[in-house]
Amino acid sequence: YSEFLTFDSKNPDAHSRDRVVLSVGHTCMLLYTILYLSDVLEMEDLKSFRQIDSRTPGHPEIETPGVDANAGPLGQGVGMGIGMAVAETMLQKDNVHYTYILVGDGDLQEPIALGAASLAGHWNLSRLIMFYDKNDIQIAGETNRCDSTDYAQLFESMKWDVQEINGHDHNEIRNAIKKAKEVDK
């Protein structure tokens, strides 16, 4: 957030912000922690995680300041994030915003995600950055039991700029974001 995103913690829903969509809604504590460290949420919000009427439900909801999209069925966040990127491209003459989407294995097994991704590649949405957490597991178990898709190859065929990195290495993540912002694709 602090190094790459356009985000004002005093106005977390400002129109001029970058968008972040967690298609993997169960990872919302990561977002809530960042919002807490950015002074958007309070410790009491984190302590009430997954409680009824909490500002920190078990999947993100837009009623929480700083949350850009509700999480729903697998793959929905991919379509929502791509839709945001399309809208920003169409509505802004000098589009300076980025849309970031975090997806997992289960998301990419859903046709809604792949259809939206194909459209994004076709339309060359260059201000869209998607992180794919390929850990070879989804809710039903290991992905090799039900899926043998080479997603890097598939996304390259859909005209995406694909970078495969170690997601635990901050420098690799940093360099990948910098490179993604330089590529017009």
Feature map (PLM): residue ranges:
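N-terminal amphipathic, basic-rich helices that act as targeting or association modules
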Residues: 1-36
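Glycine-rich ThDP/TPP pyrophosphate-binding loop and its adjacent helix/strand module
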Residues: 9, 17, 60-185
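Alpha-helix initiation and N-capping motif
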Residues: 28, 42-46, 125, 148
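Generic surface-pattern signal
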Residues: 36, 51-54, 182
